[in-house]
Swiss-Prot record:
It is found in: Cytoplasm, Cytoskeleton, Microtubule organizing center, Centrosome, Centriole. It comes from the Eukaryota. Residues 171-183 have a biased composition (Acidic residues). Promotes CCP110 ubiquitination and proteasome-dependent degradation. By counteracting accumulation of CP110, maintains normal centriolar homeostasis and preventing formation of ectopic microtubular organizing centers. This is Neuralized-like protein 4. SMART domains: NEUZ. It comes from Xenopus tropicalis. Ubiquitinated. This ubiquitination leads to proteasomal degradation. PROSITE patterns: NHR.
Length: 1477
């Protein structure tokens, strides 16, 4: 009897004698459902399972295949596609080998199976993988399968339960019976499952189907608009009956198409020509009729904004070969069904006006549209993979797919079922991310009750806010009797933390906190807890008391100095130690041998009037939360990390969707709905409390944007209107620049304009104690908006996600500005806290070693006592190519050893399931696979894999950075101070966490990297293109300044946050990080005026460098993004060797690469009279980079990456002419070295400093030269004499492409694309001897270059690539040795040279060799050649003999392409040339 192996995925439960497998929590989890056969399959055996149960809330379904991995030793991945080391999986209708797709469109689409269907997998006797569906063989899916394999089934997505039926060879006559059944009347395969994708998504929990459907569809649609995922439905198998006689050709566009259509990409892509001039004549059809149930799906690649209307798609019975294509398909009056907008047109007439809720006119680039004709004749359309239902019930059997590229639609591509599994996983990830309550608690064990205050409290204390807040209502009348205890005992390692809400300035002393063994239900509470004489430990002031007696005098932070907004906490560790925290910072061990089951206690004594319990959701976001507003930089003071308990109220407008635990709100259907998205705060605002949100997403479809304000109406009493300005009572709103009360405008031109704010901007509202309403933009007070808010009434914050604003999140606010209960006095305890700065950083998980304290919102980890128990994890799984990087913050040198870093497949949530918790060292993590770098070794589960992998980690110091990354090829990489140490291990699964062991001398770490999912593109590290959004309305400009004083030029005081101005604002320095370094000029750039800056300082710690350009918006109102590339409106930027317009690259290969400019380089900008923008490099005009610029433009410089300081030099050197005379231009040399006006250095004079660049190509060529193991004695010692002739360096020096040299002068080509390494001249020769010789090149090879250098000359008969007669040499002199008594050979072969490398470097004469770069570990191809001096008159010229004429150099005559010489001493080696591809 066939059975399943008892070892399974972690969410699988087995029953029925290990024959039935079910996925636990199927509504919350869609993976972790792997099962494997109990034994290897025998020859020809079919392992058959039945699909018992499905759940339609996920995408994807069962996956099945074979694996060579023994389940007894297998580390089960989250899904079958994660199996490595010999696995073959059928997913959907794709076949994957070790996770990589090897076959598309195979057999039956497993995603379309229904309950009761049978699926089998077989390894045939010949080693082929066969899939069987309902007893029918789908054919060979793969070959070369080893004989010992196990069957594997993944209960993924919709599939929640299966049962094993059998494991035996198929009957011999089964194939014949199948053939007979196909000819007869066979019941269709899909009879047991619905023909239509279910529109209802009802769940067992009673969630309304319409609401859930809307949530899911909008979430997926939003994800598509954000290009987060793309889902392509697999093609179901062709129906057996009634299918038209079609061929098996791939589905492509027909060659005959509309008059303006251009086909490309193998007829898979269609594009309309002249899209800005014509809007129709863009009809394309498929090359063959569609099969039944075949998906015809296209992706929108390009849209234009000029026209109304957009793409139309459908089917037609007309054969494209005989059809005369109309201007639009809606003109056809027969045999045509088209979807246009959101309706259906049949033969040009509307048959269904509202077919679906999505309009084709609203789709964006990257969206998918598909259609399929079912075997029943029903026509279905799909938008981004979602079935829109039946569009037509009686579709003819033979139809062609047709697309009309009309109006805005310009370019589409047919897409097939590529990356099927990845699309489904991204789809499911979006589904779960958009349902915040789904899958948060995967453990089946119930959590302990919420930690609250007990109702039994001190005589003068009261418990409010559902047990979370304790206060002394009459704090100015009495200073004690304010003791409150927790409602249950603390668990081990459970932190009890409270925030001080209110204080009074009347008394001395303040809050006290601690633990007690007394149960609050039976305790007669004293006036202060220090009066208890048993079972009590309290922190008071800056001391610790036990049973009323002081045991520590000077301990930690003085609690009497705390102010409102500060936090204090206490925790009992497993080892019985007691630790206190102040503002999240551990104060160290306060007591030992504290018994378990102690209650937390807070004494609201003296000045402390109110405190609130801070739960985990207040301090740390849940794993996977993507709330940019809650992320804080590692440098943020811990005192600022006490986030507010404010949330969005659960009652809201119809189009609002609350996610992220009430901290994020988004508007559904953002491109079809612009209002009905009002949200309110979850509770009333306190006086002086700021309610602050950050804008996270905007669309450019609507006019108007976010509106914000306050109301005295309770959410329960409000019938939410379309917009909040419709309310005519008790409401105050800011809309644009207008302040409105009860729907009427109070004042215009308020200090800020909400319509001009873009993504990343923060908006705050605060009601003062006097009843004034203030607004804050990015933390800056905009002044009083209105006065007279009602005193004594509850005031709620209101946000209206209107128009362009789609999504916002809470930042946590700024706390209370005035918390004093005395209205006439303001003390230092009521000073406002600063607003947290929105930023996105990686975090450590709260689950950690028992000696570790995770602080500062999870961005810092410190080890307390001892040298072990210091394991910490990343807060979530690492994404592919995501770097988790930390910085060493503290070292204690009296310990030996250092930290370890790596990855583990052990989830922090599973630590509680380990017996005894986390071990002392990360090397002992063996329950799941763990890879670590310890010292310089790489280990796997404690077993050594590699030695001497990198520099020893024991050498790290304070400030050192360590990073870990899992690459897309499943390799583990370690980074030290930003440098990749190369692959450390391979075969790393997807679901891994970063793990570190804070061991030995390392005692504190902090995260310095950022999340790939959460991070805005504009803040990514250098060398990554930034594409973040920048929303900025153009401002009114004054008249341009036609005359400008050069000496008065200075940078504007409004600049990037990392910029420091000096020297009269003429010098800008970036003082930290690699971005946020934008500076601008306050004056517009006049026409024909050359503005210049000089690069003063570069840092080798970063990649990439400065950008320079102009903007057409007023710099006074510019919200500076992180990089210049993030400016999306009215900007023209020179970056690297490209030109960007509004963040989009419009030109490549312009001028030199700015990333390679050294210190001292002068860069300039000039606007010509016709509006053309010119870039100047060291006074050299690089030509027009952009045209038709507006009249008013402001200069912008971005100090990015390597560039740390620039200075304005326009006042020091007026114009390009003066600048050219101040310093020698690149390539400039003495007049005596000039021949026919072309400059040339003859004796290896050191090149211009501009050429001495840190060029990556030169470094790569140098590494290859080192691999040749050539003696250093052959080369000049000074490495600065090596010259790179790559395109960037060549342009930067201003070198000519061709030069003339010798007497008489002869032209030769520069070695562009090569690197030159100068060779030593023979001691017998002089430099001046060869000044009048000509220059030529000879191709060589990596295997013969050493012999040529040993000989020292290209003699006739030397062992070069073009000659074959051997010759002897004298190794001592390095020159040929004459052979006594031997006559020279009569027939010497000529040495063949050429004045151009286009000929000398042909593969026949200069073969390419492959090598692995020791630094990047990538494979490259390399060529070597020699540059030689040739004596005039010693050679003959001739036509090429090695290739056709059309491959020659256009400047070198073909009759002079070869130099042939047989004379001894006619050539001298000048340099070794290397080219790498």
């Amino acid at each position: 009897m066939a059975e399943l192996h008892p070892r399974t995925g972690k969410l699988i439960s087995l029953s029925n004698g290990n024959r039935t497998a079910a996925r636990k929590q199927p509504a919350q989890e869609f993976n972790q459902g792997l099962v494997v056969s109990a034994r290897p399959l025998g020859p020809g055996e079919v392992f058959t399972v039945r699909l018992d149960r499905k759940m339609n809330s996920w995408s994807g379904s069962m996956e099945i295949g074979l694996t060579t991995q023994d389940p007894a030793f297998l580390d089960f991945p989250s899904s079958a596609t994660g199996l490595k080391g010999g696995s073959w999986i059928v997913s959907g209708c794709s076949v994957l080998e070790d996770g990589r797709s090897v076959l598309e469109e195979y057999g039956q689409d497993l995603d379309q199976l229904g309950e009761g269907d049978r699926v089998g997998v077989q390894r045939s006797i010949s080693g082929e993988l066969h899939l069987w569906v309902n007893g029918r063989d789908c054919g060979a899916a793969s070959c070369g399968i080893p004989p010992r394999v196990w069957a594997v089934v993944d209960l993924y997505g919709k599939c929640t339960q299966i049962t094993v039926l059998s494991c035996q060879p198929p009957p011999e006559e089964e194939e014949e019976e199948d053939a007979e059944e196909q000819e007869g009347s066979l019941v269709p395969l899909g009879q047991s499952r619905p023909d239509k994708f279910p529109n209802s998504l009802d769940t067992d929990s009673g969630f309304p189907s319409t609401e859930l459907s809307a949530v899911v569809s909008n979430a997926i649609l939003s994800a598509y608009h954000g290009s987060l995922l793309s889902v392509s439905l697999g093609s179901p198998p062709a129906a057996i009956e009634h299918s038209p006689p079609t061929c098996n050709d791939a589905l492509l566009f027909h060659e005959k198409c509309g008059t303006l259509i251009k086909l490309s990409n193998g007829n898979k892509t269609a594009e309309r020509r002249r899209p800005l001039d014509e809007f129709n004549n863009g009809v394309v059809m498929t090359n063959r009729p569609l099969r039944d149930c075949e998906m015809f799906e296209i992706r929108i690649d390009k849209l234009v904004d000029k026209w109304s209307g957009s793409i139309e798609i459908g089917v037609t019975t007309h054969n494209p070969n005989s059809l005369e294509y109309p201007a639009t398909m809606t003109n056809l009056r027969s045999g045509t069904i088209m979807m246009s907008g959101c309706g259906i047109l049949t033969n040009g007439k509307g048959t269904r006006r509202e077919y679906c809720e999505f309009s084709l006119d609203e789709l964006q680039e990257g969206d998918h549209i598909g259609l399929t004709r079912k075997s029943s004749g029903a026509l279905h359309f799909y938008i981004n993979g979602m079935d829109q239902g039946v569009a037509s019930c009686q579709t003819p059997p033979v139809v062609y797919g047709v697309v009309d590229l009309y109006g805005m639609a310009v370019k589409v591509t047919i897409v097939h079922n590529h990356n099927h599994a990845d699309r489904l996983r991204r789809n499911n990830a979006i589904l779960r991310a958009r349902s915040p309550d789904t899958g948060r608690h995967s453990s089946s064990t119930p959590e302990p009750g919420q930690l609250l205050f007990h109702s039994n409290c001190g005589q003068k204390a009261s418990i409010i806010n559902g047990g979370r807040t304790a206060l002394r209502p009459h704090a100015t009348d009495d200073f004690n009797h304010g003791v409150v205890l927790s409602n249950r005992p603390l668990q081990n390692n459970e932190v009890f933390q409270v925030r001080i809400d209110k204080m009074v300035d009347k008394w001395a002393g303040s809050i006290e906190i601690g633990v007690t063994t007394h149960n609050p239900a039976y305790l007669q509470l004293p006036s202060t807890m220090t009066n208890l004489r048993s079972g009590t430990w309290m922190m008071t002031g800056n001391g610790v008391m036990h049973n009323g007696t002081t045991i520590l005098d000077e301990y930690g932070h003085n609690l009497d100095r705390l102010k409102a907004g500060d936090t204090v906490g206490v925790v009992r560790r497993e080892d019985g130690t007691l630790n206190f925290f102040v503002n999240g910072i551990a104060q160290g061990v306060a007591a030992w041998n504290v018994p378990p089951n102690v209650f937390a206690v807070v004494d609201l004594y003296g000045q402390a009037a109110q405190a609130t319990i801070m739960d985990e959701s207040d301090a740390l976001p849940l794993p996977g939360d993507e709330d940019e507003g809650l992320a804080l930089t590692p440098g943020t003071p811990c005192a600022l990390l006490s986030l507010s308990d404010l949330r969005f109220h659960h009652l809201h407008g119809a189009n609002a969707l609350i996610t992220n635990g009430g901290r994020t709100v988004l508007r559904k259907n953002s491109r079809s709905e612009f209002n009905d998205a009002i949200v309110m705060s979850s509770r009333p605002l306190r006086d002086g409390e700021m309610f602050e949100i950050v804008i996270q997403k905007m669309v450019d479809r609507w006019s108007g944007s976010i509106e914000a304000g306050v109301t005295a109406i309770r959410p329960e009493d409000l019938e939410f209107p379309n917009t909040m300005t419709d309310i005519d009572y008790d409401t105050w709103m800011l809309s644009g620049t207008a302040i409105m009360q009860d729907g009427n405008t109070l004042r215009n031109n308020y200090g800020c304009d909400l319509d001009s704010l873009g993504a990343g901007s923060r908006i705050g509202m605060m009601k003062t104690i006097r009843g004034d309403l203030h607004y804050f933009i990015n933390g800056e007070d905009q002044g009083v908006a209105c006065t007279g808010l009602p005193m004594g009434r509850d005031i709620y914050a209101v946000i209206d996600l209107y128009g362009q604003c789609v999504q916002v999140s809470l930042t946590g606010g700024s706390g209370l500005v005035d918390n004093s209960l005395s209205a006439s006095h303001v003390t230092d305890k009521s000073l406002p806290s600063q607003s947290p700065v929105p930023s996105v950083s990686h975090r450590f998980h709260t689950v950690c070693g028992k000696n570790v304290s995770v602080l500062c919102d999870g961005t810092r980890a410190e080890r307390g006592a001892g040298c072990s128990h210091g394991i910490v994890f990343s807060s979530r799984e690492l994404l592919t190519n995501e770097t988790f990087e930390i910085r060493v913050e503290k070292i204690e040198p009296h310990w030996s050893g250092s930290c370890n870093i790596g990855v583990t497949s052990l989830s922090p949530h599973e630590v509680s399931l380990l017996g005894g918790g986390l071990p002392e060292r990360a090397l002992e993590l063996r329950s799941k696979v763990t890879w670590l770098v310890c010292g310089s070794e790489v280990t796997r589960n404690g077993q050594r894999l590699r030695e001497n992998y990198c520099n020893s980690l024991e050498r790290v110091r304070v400030g050192s950075r360590l990073g870990v990354r899992r690459d897309s090829d499943d390799t583990l990489h370690i980074l030290m101070n930003g440098e990749d140490m190369g692959p450390a291990a391979c075969g790393i699964p997807k679901a891994v966490y970063a793990v570190l062991d804070i061991h030995g001398c390392i005692t504190a770490l902090s995260t310095v990297s950022s999340s790939l999912l959460e991070e805005p593109d504009a803040t990514k590290p250098p060398s990554i293109t930034s594409e973040s959004e920048e929303e900025e309305d153009p401002a009114d400009h004054g008249d341009p300044h036609t005359v400008i004083q050069a000496h008065s030029l200075q940078f504007l005081a409004n600049h990037g946050k990392n910029i420091l101005l000096s020297h009269g604002n003429r010098t800008a320095t970036r003082v930290s990080s690699y971005n946020q370094g934008i500076v601008v000029l306050p004056q517009p750039l006049p026409r024909l005026f050359l503005f210049q800056i000089r690069i003063d300082q570069l840092s080798p710690h970063w990649t990439s460098s400065l950008s320079i350009g102009v903007i057409a918006v007023s710099p006074e109102r510019l919200n500076f993004p992180a990089t210049a590339a993030a400016l999306k409106r009215s900007s023209w930027i020179f970056q690297r060797s490209a030109v960007l317009c509004n963040g989009v690259k419009i030109r490549e290969g312009y001028g030199p690469n700015l990333d390679l400019c050294p210190e001292g380089t002068c860069l300039g900008l000039l606007l010509d009279s016709s509006g053309g923008l010119h870039l100047y490099v060291n006074g050299l005009d690089q030509g027009v980079g952009a045209q038709d610029l507006p009249e008013v433009c402001y200069v912008l410089v971005d100090l990015y990456g390597q560039c740390e300081q620039v200075s304005i030099v326009t006042g020091e050197a007026q114009g390009a002419e003066l600048d050219a005379h101040e310093g020698q231009l690149p390539g400039e040399r003495e007049k005596a070295d000039m021949v026919d006006g072309v400059k040339e250095s003859l004796c290896w004079v050191p090149p211009d400093p501009v050429a001495l660049l840190s060029c990556e190509y030169l470094a790569l060529c140098t590494r290859f030269k080192d691999l040749l193991l050539l003696p250093d004695g052959y080369f000049l010692e000074d490495s600065k004499l090596c010259v790179c002739h790559c395109d960037s360096c060549h342009k930067l020096r201003g070198d000519e492409t061709y030069r003339k040299r010798g007497d008489p002068p002869r032209e030769y080509a520069e070695p562009i694309g090569w690197c030159s390494f100068p060779l030593r001249l023979s001691p017998r020769s002089s430099c001046a001897q060869y000044k009048k010789w000509h220059i030529a090149y000879q191709g060589s090879s990596a295997g013969t270059i050493r012999r040529t250098l040993d000989r020292g000359d290209l003699l006739p008969g030397s062992a070069c690539i073009l000659t074959s007669v051997p010759a002897k040499s004298d190794p001592q002199s390095g020159f040929p040795a004459a052979e006594p008594n031997v006559l020279p050979p009569r027939d010497l072969q000529s040495v063949v040279l050429s004045p151009t490398l286009r000929y000398a470097a042909l593969p026949e004469m200069c073969p390419k060799v492959m090598f692995r770069d020791p630094r990047s570990q990538r494979m490259f191809g390399a060529q070597v050649a020699l540059q030689v001096c040739v004596r005039p008159g010693s050679y003959k010229t001739g036509p090429p003999s090695a290739c056709a004429i059309d491959l020659m150099d256009p400047r070198i005559p073909s009759s002079e392409m070869e130099f042939l010489t047989k004379e001894k001493g006619a050539t001298v080696l000048r340099g070794l040339l290397v080219r790498v591809e």
